[in-house]
Amino acid sequence: MEFLFEYGLFFAKVATLLVAFVVVVSVVVGASQKNKYGEGRGHLEITPLNQQFEDLKDTMLIATTDESLQKAEEKKLTKAKKKLLSEQKKTAKNVSESDVTKRSKVYVLNFDGNISASAVGHLREEITAVLTQATPNDEVLLKLESAGGMVHSYGLASSQLDRLRKKNVPLTVCVDKVAASGGYMMACVADKILAAPFAIIGSIGVVAQMPNFNKVLKKNDVEFELLTAGEHKRTLTMFGENTEKGREKFIEELEETHQLFKEYVSTRRPQIDIDKIATGEIWYGSR
């Protein structure tokens, strides 16, 4: 009898472990299937700003009305909205689809950039969505904030804005705080840049920095080996002994990147003296 009890207890433990294993595997497989078939990619949130500002206007009107008259004002606004909605429905019946399409629209996007421009994926999807409807009569307004970062990441972000340019959709970039280096690479694509007086703009330059621990390793009798195939596979390293030849090659690559940056800006801003301003320095929006 005791044997049967112990056997049953052992069987219950094994069954519990098997169930737990199946649950874990199901979760992992489910997650991989979502990634494989593009589920869980997020969604676009589209907010009609006209209605938002109308609601704000009404709220302020009621808030600044004498308390004894607020209810009457609310009823008045509600009645006016119903009347306007009714008129719009009547008008809509007589308006052709082409007339609706001709109405100019402003699409407002946001880009808050970090060093790797990780928001570029969202920006790509947003611009794809806008381009399904936008025409040269419309406009895209991008609220941009970025101090720059990796060259290839911001090159990709800038190329997304170039898609609007190629479709002749006007682009305005608004800078409240900073659009420098890679951020300015994005901003220069725009037809117009609107910057706050003390917003930081520019920094058309390239920078690279790294520590070198080779002397520390030698001092502590630690050997470090770096094996490469290809003369310039590694130029400067953090742990190896850097050479003047490697340093010269690294600077050459920086200069080449800087030249590409200058060409990109001057193509989109032909009116500026690129050699004069592409010194890496920044300037303020009011300047």
Regions found by a protein language model. Name each.
Residues C174, L227, D275-K276:
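Residue-level detector of family-conserved "landmark" positions at structurally sensitive sites
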Residues S146-S153, T172-M185, G280:
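Gly/Ser-rich catalytic serine loop of serine hydrolases
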Residues G183-K192, P197, G285-R287:
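Active-site-proximal glycine-rich helix-loop-beta segment
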Residues M1-V169, A190-S266:
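Small-residue-centered hinge/linker elements
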